[in-house]
């Protein structure tokens, strides 16, 4: 009997597999970290073979440790780090280069050239995105231009492109299926969100052959089956795909227009469900596809913050101020406030709503009174301030008032941060009992496609662990936020040559 769904959650720092029962409970999980490669300043890469190796490894591990046979699995769903770009040889299945990660900034000069060509407004209106090295399109161009023989092979139909979801499905099906879903396609800067197809004008400008791109499918349907050699002969339907942030929006149950969530991971990612009509931002946000199910497309506004949890890792690994990420709450709590200190973690530039590829990190407001506690606290507060930047932009674009912010991801377990988040946005923050909503969303999408769950089931399993309500008065809130805005302004354009 098929009593379970498995979610494969392939993130920036690790690959995970989570096993769910029909009540939406986590039965077992497994996780393996993946190596970060930094070959040059502002370059970030992953070994695509390691991504597959770790992901297939945890898939097998979670079955073995749970004592579950593959034929007991009803479906597999995939949530993945978005924009990260893999190009591989169609025949051998081997990547031609390391995957270029979403954080990588090497293609900033290509982005500048696109702006000089007057494509800024065309790309914003048709893809919903801004021209930035964050997205896949310029990464594909860079790989075709810089890997020996790649462009010729691509034109001859010998190479395939995919975001991480495509790469995993290709391997799960042993090269039989080359697909992506609308959510991931909408993050490439090559996809027209109105025509719901690859954009020929952008492909032509970047000289990217359409033939190397995956077929685009809905977020909840059967794309293919695991190859008989992958999981002991079992052919399990792969039936749910969503980029990690859209998956979290779905996993949080943000099914109605105006509902919003924030995921605190390596970066911070806020998404607001805007319903069946795309809202083109005038305030530095992205317009993206939330999900596509049963022929209906739902859109979202997104604010992408590049550095969030990664700033806490920086405190631990680079500055050695803390031993573990969990220590951050303890040390931050030793100071009642950050004493006018602001940390702007623009290590890879600034994302929404600023979109400055040349901003760099800074600590502002240092005095002799400042010690470890203040710097740790200011670093945590930077996550909340960046969230406020995006929340304000979303209110302007959507013309909707935010009632509640739903949160998930590792850092949302930090009570001090969640209280400050509520204080600085002046809104209730809700934390669910299961904070692994990214994996949950992919599981839900997969289960829906095979009839394991229905929409009513998904609404029943949403449970709130804690609510944080504002305790800071409005004048203090605005004074602190004004200091943040001043600090951000100082960091902008820092790494520009001229």
UniProtKB/Swiss-Prot annotation:
Activity control summary: Activated by phosphorylation and inhibited by fructose 1,6-bisphosphate (FBP).
Q: Where does glycerol bind?
A: 82-83, 134, 244-245
Q: Name the pathway.
A: Polyol metabolism; glycerol degradation via glycerol kinase pathway; sn-glycerol 3-phosphate from glycerol: step 1/1
Enzyme category, top tier = transferase
Task: Establish whether keyword Protease is in the entry.
Answer: no
- Family to which this protein belongs: Belongs to the FGGY kinase family.
| Protein name from the UniProt record | Glycerol kinase
Q: Which organism is it from?
A: Natranaerobius thermophilus (strain ATCC BAA-1301 / DSM 18059 / JW/NM-WN-LF)
């Amino acid at each position: 009997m098929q009593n379970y769904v498995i979610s494969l959650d392939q993130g920036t720092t690790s690959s995970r597999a989570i096993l769910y029962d029909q009540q939406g409970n986590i039965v077992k999980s497994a996780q393996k970290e993946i190596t970060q490669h930094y070959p040059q300043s502002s370059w970030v890469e992953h070994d695509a073979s390691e991504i597959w190796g770790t992901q297939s490894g945890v898939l097998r591990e979670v079955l073995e440790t749970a004592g579950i046979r593959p034929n007991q699995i009803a479906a597999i769903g995939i949530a993945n780090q978005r924009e990260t770009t893999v190009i591989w040889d169609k025949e051998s299945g081997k990547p031609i280069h390391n995957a270029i990660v979403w954080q990588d900034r090497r293609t900033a000069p290509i982005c500048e050239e696109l702006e000089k060509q007057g494509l800024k407004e065309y790309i914003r209106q048709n893809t919903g995105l801004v021209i930035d090295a964050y997205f896949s399109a310029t990464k594909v161009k860079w790989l075709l231009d810089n890997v020996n023989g790649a462009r010729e092979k691509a034109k001859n139909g010998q190479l395939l492109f995919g975001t991480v979801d495509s790469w995993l499905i290709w391997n799960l099906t042993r090269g039989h299926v080359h697909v992506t879903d609308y959510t991931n396609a909408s993050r490439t800067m090559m996809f027209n969100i109105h025509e719901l197809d690859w954009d020929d004008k952008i492909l032509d400008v970047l000289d990217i052959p359409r033939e190397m791109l995956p077929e685009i499918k809905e977020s909840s349907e059967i794309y293919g089956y695991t190859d008989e050699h992958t999981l002991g002969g079992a052919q399990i339907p792969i039936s749910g795909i969503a980029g990690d942030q859209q998956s979290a929006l779905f996993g949080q149950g943000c099914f109605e227009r105006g509902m919003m969530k924030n995921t605190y991971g390596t970066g911070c990612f806020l998404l607001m469900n805007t319903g069946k009509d795309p809202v083109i931002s005038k305030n530095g946000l992205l317009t993206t596809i939330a999900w596509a199910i049963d022929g209906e497309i739902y859109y979202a506004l997104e604010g992408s913050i590049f550095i969030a949890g990664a700033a806490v890792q920086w405190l631990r690994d680079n500055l050695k101020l803390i031993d573990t990420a969990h220590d951050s709450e303890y040390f931050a709590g030793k100071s009642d406030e950050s004493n006018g200190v602001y940390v702007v973690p623009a290590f890879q530039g600034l994302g929404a709503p600023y979109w400055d590829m040349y901003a760099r990190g800074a600590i502002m407001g240092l005095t002799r009174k400042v010690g470890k506690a203040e710097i740790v606290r200011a670093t945590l507060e930077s996550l909340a301030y960046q969230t406020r930047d995006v929340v304000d932009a979303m209110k302007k674009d959507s013309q909707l008032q935010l009632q509640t912010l739903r949160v998930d991801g590792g850092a949302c377990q930090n009570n001090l941060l969640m209280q400050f988040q509520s204080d600085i946005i002046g809104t209730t923050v809700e934390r669910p009992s299961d904070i692994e909503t990214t994996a949950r969303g992919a599981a839900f999408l997969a289960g829906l496609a095979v009839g394991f769950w229905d929409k009513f089931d998904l609404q029943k399993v949403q449970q709130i662990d804690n609510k944080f309500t504002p305790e800071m008065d409005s004048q203090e809130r605005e004074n602190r936020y004004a200091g943040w805005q001043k600090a951000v302004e100082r960091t902008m354009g820092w790494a520009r040559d001229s």
